[in-house]
């Protein structure tokens, strides 16, 4: 589509690998790294030097960095004439606005009946059907006589849950809400729904039973449904089935069990707010405290007041079952014992003592502490000293000395390597599972182990990460040949999402990558944090699945005593925009009042930030009511910004490529990163991007070229040559079609044909695509600062310094012709990174931007984006914004009746806007040499993901 990408040959080696990064050179006397100052300065003089330099930068930027807005004279004249014609034919602006609002109100009043009917509950109300009851009973009785069913039943009877069958049925029948807890392997997920269903069928009431069991992950919903169907000697889709996004094998309407993702049940609420088609709702894995499950818990608690016949069962790990019981009015709790062998726990002090590790690497040596972390390190050691002294006489002086300078801020991969070698040479057979925080540690440890001649030939090393090819990871479930030890390097995905049965040894490094939201800085963060006790227990449990095991915790027993009981609930560490739109579309009242009913309510500050963001996005009015745009965004299975983007794509006739962008942003890009091939993957991305300098358009080119390869029956080779996942691309294809179906049902497009010419007249127009991406991502805007047209650093409204993420195609790029960028997310990890970036020109910012102020020769948007513009053009742009907003209000407020609401002149105006967007040019102001510190470089720092 853009900048044709020629396929390279097959995959080769990585070559020399990544370079050593930017060499910062020397430091000024007493100065910090990257903050040098002239020699000879002392004390106050140093501060004055930096203050003068800061003032000089600001003065220069104010004088030179305003980019001029430019529209050619002919286009200006056309726009003025069209705007004038519109004002003559439609009357005063307030009358036009009243007309638009009337149409929108009429549209929205009838809209709810058209969507939200993709339910999981089947019939709206369960009513007794004697004939069906008898049929279900006879079917179950006949099936129970089969050899296949009896074989499965023998297995089921060995599960701890089955031994409590009568007790479980009794407590569910006697109580409206029950909490059932049990460790992995107890059988609660597969058995409890069957106990309920079989009890109803055997009592001749099968027609009154419909069990819906939510799962936090897609793969869990599928695998559990298929397992339950097998245990019932049936095909999936008979009495047990599943429903996940883009895939459904639903069971019969009555006398059945449906396993679905939590999001699917929330979607059902739009068409069936009382879930009348369900007799029992089971929330599984509630201890994970994901956002959607906590949200659904609030709804179910309220729903119990109007559904006296509904039964709610919450299933949890044992560690915090009491919390959910308290939330639901001290409802009964049942605990199912798990199947687990004893697991010995060894702490850091034990490991150091056992293997004689001295800690002589940069990970643990005091000299390896960065100056920024020095105080934190010293405080950490001071806190631990009483514990270290308590070990005197129990451990060697060598161990105590090592502990007294141990750096907990890092993962000591030398120690992990040494411990693995110790296990491989001295311990009985059994797989080793190593828990690491992220990609960087997995990659580095994998490299070290592969280079270890002592392990070569006698070990099978399997890195496990979402960025890696799944074909290699399938080995994780297979037992290796005799004499070969399996070593799995994984993130927290191996805590609950997968089970590796032959693991005997677990090495827990004690850290986990957690996404959080810094309310004060309005910034997402991704940092390595200490695990919770819940995480630690889950990790320990991986070692005792099939025989006694050992869990090596590479942190002290004192550190364990400081761990939190569980990780912070997702509702307290994420943005709330999507949740607020759900509250509004379900008519649940004030967002703040509703969320105050949560188990752990979010802060009022976090809620206010999200409300203001939705108001800026024009999804909510100031009184917190849904706008027509907000109504549509709430209906779409996308975050608000991406949802707005695809709506704008339907208006600007560039549907196909923008659907690809939306699918990739809401799921993931299709690239897989084999260990050792990181640089080759980066090069492939840049080839796909061509000269577009856009991470988003790069994704468009990947998908469109894959489609072409598939048509030529060359898809697999294309994926292999370019480090792409066929499964991910197929998922993106299905998501694109789903988005088109939603747009069709919302009447933004007349058919579901993504490729139809009428929806893609501007799909090959790069600048229109950039503008539409801007329309969705605003206010996520960054300003680039350049030297020799090379991007040196970025700034945002709230961050003086931000860097492009190393995975961006724009890292180290030159030749930019605009200083403005839009980005999808901003995350602070090792530094503040901008993810998924596209350059954008001034006109899209002016059209889609926020608060507009014109003074002198300057236009200011949202009090920080400044553009240079003469008075006449500024007035034209102001009028253009007003008329363009009215077009959007009409198209979004009543998409199904566009022909009657959009005049010929307004269509002319939209065409003229597209012409202006297509021909706009800009320039990049250069910064002077003294404007940058030495660390103002887009250094490729590998972010740990």
Language model feature labels by segment:
Residues 2-652, 686, 714, 718-721, ...:
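P-loop NTPase motor module signature
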Residues 62, 81-84, 138, 593, ...:
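Polar/charged alpha-helical tracts
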Residues 431, 485, 658, 818-819:
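Short, surface-exposed beta-edge/turn micro-motifs
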Residues 640-683:
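Leucine-rich, amphipathic alpha-helical/linker segments
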Residues 670-727, 731:
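Accessory helical subdomains and C-terminal extensions of nucleic-acid helicases
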Residues 700-703, 710, 719-722, 728-741, ...:
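Phosphate-moiety recognition in structured ligand-binding domains
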Residues 764-945:
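C-terminal accessory domains/tails appended to large, multi-domain proteins
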């Amino acid at each position: 589509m853009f900048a044709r990408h020629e396929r390279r040959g097959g995959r080769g080696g990585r070559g020399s690998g990544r370079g050593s990064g930017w060499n910062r050179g020397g430091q000024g006397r007493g100065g910090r790294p990257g903050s040098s100052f002239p020699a000879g300065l002392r004390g106050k003089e140093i501060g004055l030097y930096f203050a003068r330099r800061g003032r000089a930068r600001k003065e220069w930027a104010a004088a030179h960095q305003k980019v001029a807005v430019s529209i050619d004279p002919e286009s200006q004249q056309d726009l003025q004439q069209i705007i004038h014609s519109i004002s003559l034919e439609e009357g005063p602006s307030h009358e036009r606005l009243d007309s638009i609002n009337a149409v929108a109100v009429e549209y929205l009043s009838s809209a709810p009946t058209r969507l939200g009917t993709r339910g999981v509950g089947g019939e709206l109300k369960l009513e007794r059907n004697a004939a069906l009851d008898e049929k279900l009973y006879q079917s179950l009785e006949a099936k129970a006589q089969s050899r296949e069913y009896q074989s499965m039943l023998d297995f089921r009877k060995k599960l701890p849950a089955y031994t409590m069958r009568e007790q479980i049925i009794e407590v569910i029948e006697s109580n409206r809400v029950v909490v059932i807890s049990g460790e992995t392997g107890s059988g609660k997920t597969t058995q409890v729904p069957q106990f309920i269903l079989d009890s109803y069928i055997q009592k001749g009431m099968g027609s009154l039973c419909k069990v819906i069991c939510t799962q936090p992950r897609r793969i869990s919903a599928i695998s559990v449904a298929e397992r339950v169907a097998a245990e019932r000697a049936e095909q999936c889709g008979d009495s047990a089935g599943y429903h996940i996004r883009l895939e459904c094998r639903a069971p019969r309407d009555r006398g059945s069990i449906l396993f679905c993702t939590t999001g699917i049940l929330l979607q059902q609420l739009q068409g069936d707010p009382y879930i009348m088609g369900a007799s029992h709702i089971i929330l599984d894995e509630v201890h994970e405290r994901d956002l959607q499950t906590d949200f659904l818990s609030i709804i179910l608690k309220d729903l119990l007041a109007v559904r006296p016949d509904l039964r709610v069962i919450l299933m949890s790990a044992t560690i915090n079952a009491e919390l959910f019981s308290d939330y639901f009015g001290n409802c009964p709790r049942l605990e199912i014992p798990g199947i687990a062998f004893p697991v010995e726990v060894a702490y850091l002090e034990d490991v150091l003592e056992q293997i004689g590790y001295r800690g002589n690497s940069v990970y643990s040596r005091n000299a390896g502490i960065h100056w920024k972390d020095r105080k934190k390190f010293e405080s950490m050691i001071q806190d631990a000293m009483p514990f270290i002294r308590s070990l005197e006489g129990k451990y060697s002086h060598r161990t105590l000395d090592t502990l007294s300078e141990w750096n907990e801020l890092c993962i000591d991969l030398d120690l992990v390597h040494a411990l693995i070698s110790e296990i491989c040479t001295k311990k009985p057979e059994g797989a080793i599972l190593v828990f690491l925080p992220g990609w960087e540690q997995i990659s580095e440890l994998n490299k070290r182990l592969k280079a270890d001649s002592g392990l070569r030939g006698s070990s099978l090393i399997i890195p496990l990460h979402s960025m890696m090819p799944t074909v290699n990871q399938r080995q994780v479930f297979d037992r290796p040949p005799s004499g070969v030890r399996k070593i799995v390097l994984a993130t927290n995905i191996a805590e609950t999402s997968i089970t590796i049965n032959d693991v005997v040894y677990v090495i827990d490094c004690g850290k986990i990558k957690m996404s959080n939201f810094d309310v004060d800085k309005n910034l997402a963060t991704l940092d390595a944090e200490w695990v919770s006790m819940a995480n630690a227990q889950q990790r320990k449990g991986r070692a005792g699945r099939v025989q006694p095991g050992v869990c090596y915790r590479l942190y002290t027993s004192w550190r364990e005593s400081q761990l939190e009981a569980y990780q912070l609930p997702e509702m307290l560490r994420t943005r709330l925009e999507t949740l607020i739109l759900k509250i509004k579309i379900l008519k649940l009242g004030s967002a703040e009042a509703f969320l105050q009913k949560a188990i752990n309510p979010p802060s009022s500050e976090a809620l206010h930030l999200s409300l203001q963001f939705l108001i800026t996005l024009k999804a909510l009015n100031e009184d917190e009511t849904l706008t027509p745009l907000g109504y549509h965004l709430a209906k779409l299975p996308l975050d608000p910004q991406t949802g707005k983007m695809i709506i704008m794509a339907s208006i600007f006739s560039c549907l196909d490529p923008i659907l690809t962008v939306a699918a990739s942003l809401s799921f993931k890009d299709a690239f897989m990163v084999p260990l050792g091939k990181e640089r080759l993957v980066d090069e492939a991305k840049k080839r796909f991007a061509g000269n577009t300098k856009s991470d988003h358009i790069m994704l468009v080119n990947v998908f469109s070229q894959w489609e072409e390869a598939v048509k030529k029956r060359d898809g697999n080779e294309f994926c292999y040559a370019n480090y792409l996942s066929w499964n991910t691309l197929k998922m993106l294809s299905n998501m694109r079609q789903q988005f088109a179906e939603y747009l069709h049902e919302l009447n933004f497009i007349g058919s579901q044909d993504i490729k139809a010419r009428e929806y893609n007249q501007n799909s090959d127009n790069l600048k229109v695509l950039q503008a539409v991406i801007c329309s969705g991502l605003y206010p996520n805007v960054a300003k680039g600062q350049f030297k020799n047209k090379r991007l040196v650093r970025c700034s945002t409204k709230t961050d003086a310094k931000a860097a492009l993420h190393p995975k961006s195609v724009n890292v180290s790029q030159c030749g930019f012709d605009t200083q403005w960028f839009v980005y999808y997310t901003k995350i602070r990890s090792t530094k503040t990174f901008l993810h998924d970036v596209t350059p954008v020109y001034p006109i899209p910012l002016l059209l889609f931007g926020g608060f507009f102020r014109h003074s002198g020769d300057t236009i200011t948007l949202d009090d920080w984006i400044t553009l240079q513009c003469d008075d006449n053009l500024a007035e034209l742009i102001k009028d253009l914004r007003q008329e363009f907003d009215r077009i959007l209000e009409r198209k979004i407020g009543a998409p199904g009746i566009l022909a009657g609401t959009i005049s010929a002149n307004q269509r002319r105006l939209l065409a003229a806007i597209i012409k202006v967007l297509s021909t706009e040019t800009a320039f990049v102001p250069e910064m002077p040499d003294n404007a940058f510190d030495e660390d103002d470089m887009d250094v490729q720092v590998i972010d740990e993901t």
